[in-house]
Amino acid sequence: MSAIERFDVVVVGSGIVGLGAALAAVDRGCSVLVIDRASEIAGASVRNFGHLCFTPQSGLARDYAMASREIWLRLAHDAGFWIDDAGTLVVARHDDELQLLRELAAQRLPRSPGAAVEVELLTADEIETLAALPAGTAVGGARLPLDLQVDPRFAAAAIRDHLLGRGVEFRMRTAAGRIASGRVDTSRGPVDAGTIVVAVNHDIDQLFPVMAERYGVVRCGLDMMRVTADLPRPLTGPLLTGWSLIRYSAFTSMAASSDVRDRLTAERPELAALDLNQMYTQRPDGSLIVGDSHWKGESVSPFQPEDAARALLDEFESLFQHRADVVERWQGVYATAGEEFLIEEIEPDVLVTVVTTGIGMTTGLGLAEKVVGAHLDTHSRTLTESTML
Ligand SMILES: Cc1cc2nc3c(=O)[nH]c(=O)nc-3n(C[C@H](O)[C@H](O)[C@H](O)COP(=O)(O)OP(=O)(O)OC[C@H]3O[C@@H](n4cnc5c(N)ncnc54)[C@H](O)[C@@H]3O)c2cc1C
């Protein structure tokens, strides 16, 4: 009978949260196995905008976001993938949107000499130039200089390759079944582990359905597309619109946010019904990622109604005054719940780490460092003893 393999840390899920967990573990000298039931990294972590929106977060998300920022910069250097530090652009097309940006800028003033400016207010001319918009589109805007952008299709794979080089083992096409303290039963047999990290995004409702129901986790399906368009100049950063100002927590905590929400909902009920977040990122090849709509439920329909895609294209063409040619369409899914994170040690040394809203690229690496790293630090004596057995 062959002996059961043993690792200090087994991570279930090779998306950005799982990769972050593997990084936190290998940084602490652990032996690490990452398993994923897919043959490639193909979940939400490659289907997103690649927008690392640190500034509009608050509370725990802000802590994780700022920790993530350092890790993204380090990884981009160490793993050698493209990262852009030009910051996020926000176009205000109405006075209430500009008012919200002014409130945020006043709240995020640098507290000490030399501290970074987090929100730079822009004139209408400035935002139109930086975001390739026609004259007369904006009443003003802002730049959020701390924010970063990556190309998600390449970043996750580059991080995996970097981790491989540091001795982390990846076992793809391998599904986790029963998970209990010390052991993961996989579709290739059992594996023993000092610590198990479950980073399976919305599939948490399959692995731990009772816990997922307790947290009110459902799935959120998003329609996305990649387009080419003959814009007069490139975007100088991810571009958010008023629809984004009613989403991210630091924006929604501003007094003007309810004015923006009420007006947009009254003016464009059909877009509000799609739960639209009209935003854009431009990839290094010049094509633009366009999104997104949101549909929440226990399952996500495999059939994508064309009205969402039509609305995304219409809004693109009306904003930029340029035709968009669709290159690709896809659907993304993430877990969503009342709180932004589901973090629980469901059994001793079994950590569940799920970002339960659409900010996992922004916060996932920091979450992994703060939750998994802190757990390993606390349990380092046990770990060293078990590794030496
Ligand atoms: C369309 C879209 C746009 C988004 N835009 C942004 C953005 O711009 N900025 C931002 O911060 N966030 C964004 N997000 C959110 C972000 O992408 C996610 O929060 C993040 O990628 C989640 O990472 P993850 O590692 O938890 O999940 P995933 O990347 O989905 O990885 C989970 C992995 O678990 C594996 N798995 C599941 N069950 C099992 C099992 N039983 N056994 C083995 N493996 C299993 C899956 O195969 C998958 O590979 C967006 C999300 C979507 C869908």
Language-model segment annotations:
Residues 9-33:
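N-terminal Rossmann-like FAD-binding beta1-loop-alpha1 element of flavoenzymes
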Residues 5-7, 186-195:
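Core beta-strand elements of the Rossmann-like FAD/NAD(P) dinucleotide-binding domain
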Residues 49-130:
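Dinucleotide-binding Rossmann-like beta1-alpha1 core, especially the glycine-rich loop
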Residues 142-180, 193-194:
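Helical element adjacent to the flavin cofactor pocket in flavoenzyme catalytic cores
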Residues 275, 284-289, 295-389:
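C-terminal catalytic lobe of FAD-dependent flavoproteins
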Residues 52, 82-83, 202-323:
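Active-site substrate-recognition segment that forms the wall
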Residues 63-64, 91-100, 142-161, 303-308, ...:
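Short beta-strand to alpha-helix junction loop
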Residues 26-46:
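Glycine-rich FAD pyrophosphate-binding loop
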